């Protein structure tokens, strides 16, 4: 049975892939759950058109990501002001959302807080820090910022 996937299925494919599966798997699992549609000539042409549009959109997104990466590289004076104790320890921590707001306040581009990578842990003391930003699948930038006492 030939089907066009509408959702990512492990060990089978991604949305838009044309796959050949056993009739029972297609009829009893993929089609009822909406994970696939029957492959017809019209549907195959529609999938090809969608893939072309997605490729064009991916190229535009990559170009925009390169522009944002350049803006971040030229950005200076990013500082996050937080309340601290006398010894420089923060009351709380600096999170990705705080960094994104500081970038915008410094005249930089607006960033999604989920794209800022703080996997090493949140910042808990004053000083200079650097975090990575995922702008596109294979385009990453860096934000240098300083945590200062309020």
Swiss-Prot record:
Task: Kindly give the SUPFAM superfamilies that the UniProt entry links to this protein.
Answer: L9 N-domain-like (SSF55658), Ribosomal protein L9 C-domain (SSF55653)
For this record, the Gene Ontology CC terms, alphabetical, are:
ribonucleoprotein complex; ribosome
Q: Which GO terms describe its molecular function?
A: rRNA binding; structural constituent of ribosome
Q: Which Pfam families match?
A: Ribosomal_L9_C, Ribosomal_L9_N
What are the annotated disulfide bridges?
Answer: none
The highest taxon in the source lineage is Bacteria
Q: Which UniProt keywords apply?
A: Ribonucleoprotein, Ribosomal protein, RNA-binding, rRNA-binding
Name the Gene Ontology biological process terms. translation
Role of this protein:
Binds to the 23S rRNA.
Q: Which family does it belong to?
A: Belongs to the bacterial ribosomal protein bL9 family.
The protein, known as: Large ribosomal subunit protein bL9
- Which species is this record about? Corynebacterium kroppenstedtii (strain DSM 44385 / JCM 11950 / CIP 105744 / CCUG 35717)
